[in-house]
């Protein structure tokens, strides 16, 4: 269970990475993402996340809310089926598992520098970290695929589907062949208060610095 939660936390970072707002519907997915990187500085919304193994086994569906503010700040709050909180203040990323009484702390560059989070929190030069290509339209969405140039990234590809000037779905295939699908909803672009990204570990919990 602990390994599953650690993986879920990493995938949460991946998921926040691809949140986007886009120009006119006629624009390609790549153009929409480019516009997002250049113009959308922050947003809030809701998510639902499910993971399927190569053998078809499923993990419990997660749901919750998120917020982000570039560069490098985000909050990913899992509410169901168990609580988990991931917060970045722009310098450090805190992952808090209440029932494990543990907080894991990583530097932002370590946590998102070579992950799909660079799509959201980076400077927009995706070609440096990813090989980006267009995909055929599917399920009423316009798609692009980002493959990491770093073989140690921990995932093989992330597909991003956009609709009505907003991201609708993210599909990530990790190094073990698991596919994680994140459905996004209620996306509201706009500035997010800095207080949303502040986190102090509760007294009595184990703090593990990576």
Curated annotation (Swiss-Prot):
One cellular component (GO) term of this entry: outer membrane-bounded periplasmic space
Any one GO biological process: lipoprotein localization to outer membrane
Keyword list, A-Z: Chaperone, Periplasm, Protein transport, Signal, Transport
InterPro entries xrefs: LolA/LolB/LppX (IPR029046), OM_lipoprot_carrier_LolA-like (IPR004564), OM_lipoprot_carrier_LolA_Pbac (IPR018323)
Subcellular location: Periplasm
Residues spanning the signal sequence: 1-26
Transmembrane portions of the chain: none
Lineage top rank: taxon: Bacteria
CDD domains (alphabetical): LolA
The family this protein is said to belong to: Belongs to the LolA family.
PANTHER family reported for this sequence: OUTER-MEMBRANE LIPOPROTEIN CARRIER PROTEIN (PTHR35869:SF1)
SUBUNIT field: Monomer.
Known function: Participates in the translocation of lipoproteins from the inner membrane to the outer membrane. Only forms a complex with a lipoprotein if the residue after the N-terminal Cys is not an aspartate (The Asp acts as a targeting signal to indicate that the lipoprotein should stay in the inner membrane).
Protein name: Outer-membrane lipoprotein carrier protein
């Amino acid at each position: 269970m602990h390994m599953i939660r650690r993986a879920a936390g990493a995938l949460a970072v991946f998921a926040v990475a691809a949140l986007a707002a886009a120009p006119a519907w006629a624009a390609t997915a790549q153009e929409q993402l480019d516009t997002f990187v250049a113009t959308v500085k922050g947003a809030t919304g809701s998510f639902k996340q499910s993971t399927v193994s190569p053998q078809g086994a499923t993990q419990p569906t997660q749901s919750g809310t998120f917020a982000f503010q570039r560069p490098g700040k985000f909050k990913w709050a899992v509410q169901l089926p168990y609580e988990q909180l991931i917060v970045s203040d722009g310098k450090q990323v805190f992952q808090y598992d209440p029932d494990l009484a543990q907080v894991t702390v990583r530097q932002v560059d370590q946590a998102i520098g070579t992950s799909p989070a660079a799509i959201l929190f980076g400077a927009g030069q995706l070609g440096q970290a990813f090989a980006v290509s267009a995909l055929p339209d599917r399920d009423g969405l316009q798609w692009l695929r980002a493959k990491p140039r770093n073989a140690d990234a921990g995932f093989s590809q992330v597909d991003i589907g956009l609709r009505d000037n907003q991201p609708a779905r993210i599909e990530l295939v990790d190094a073990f062949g698991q596919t994680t699908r994140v459905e996004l909803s209620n996306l509201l672009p706009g500035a997010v208060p800095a207080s949303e990204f502040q986190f102090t570990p509760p007294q009595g919990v184990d703090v593990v610095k990576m």
